[in-house]
Amino acid sequence: MNKNYNSYLGLSLEQEFKLKLYSQIVETLNEKQKXRLLLEILKYMLLNDNILKYLIKYTNLK
């Protein structure tokens, strides 16, 4: 990823480092492994969305 994109997302230095490590790991995977990983990541993103929606809906903010 280019530096401007990371800055736009507001990634911390630690997150940028982790992203670099993960990208190196992904490069070693074959296509089938990459697809499984992608689906697993999408699943966790959807679960995260559900958690955020639940918290927004049921958190009593005053």
Swiss-Prot record:
Any Pfam family hit: NblA
GO cellular component: chloroplast
Alphabetical list of InterPro entries matching this protein: NblA (IPR007574), NblA_sf (IPR036904)
Location(s), subcellular: Plastid, Chloroplast
Keywords of the record: Chloroplast, Plastid
Main localisation: plastid
Domain of life of the organism encoding this protein: Eukaryota
Flavoprotein found in the keyword field: no
Family: Belongs to the ycf18/nblA family.
More details: Although originally identified as Cyanidium caldarium, these sequences derive from Galdieria sulphuraria.
Protein name: Uncharacterized protein ycf18
Species assigned in the record: Galdieria sulphuraria (Red alga)
